Amino acid sequence: MQLIPTSIPEVVILEPRLFRDERGYFFESFSEQRFAELVAPTHFVQDNESRSSYGVVRGLHFQLPPHAQAKLVRVLRGRVLDVAVDVRLGSPTFGQHVAVELTEDNHRMLFLPHGFAHGFSVLSEEAVFQYKCDNYYAPEAEGAIAWDDPALGINWGLPAEAIRLSAKDSKHPRLSEAPQLFNYSTTLHL
């Protein structure tokens, strides 16, 4: 597995080493020891999976302390544009985002530490998406910002007429209006 940096140092891409032959392929999708060597010691406690169809945009979600979640995400089937937005007040990259294409063919994973809002858009007919989280889901700690906040300038890779949102995701506040965010001084710095 190799680490690929992004424009925000704490958000990193992980690319596994594939072994291919006439039967197909094999790769180690996760090793806690290797992850700690490359990124940081992290103990994931919950795996989630979602299935979505073309045009779906999910996000931008996060959980607030003490229930904050770091996530390691990947696509099992299909193709998505995965987005991480820095929501750490005082961070030199506050309000900036990283957008990475994750596919069933590139097998890449994206790591988002505490202090980042997460979302993705589905670019294929269907996508099956997996999240590893270092904290359990806590509905009372849910936070979110608007997927289409003009201050973020996110290009979701979809025509406007194709975008499909849940009722909940269509009502999130802009980053500047979010009632609670993270403090940069209390989050992981790589």
Tell where the protein language model's regions lie, with residue ranges.
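Non-catalytic, conserved peripheral segments adjacent to functional cores
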Residues: 1-108, 124-126, 131-190
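Short beta-strand His + acidic residue motifs that chelate non-heme Fe in jelly-roll/DSBH
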Residues: 110, 118-123
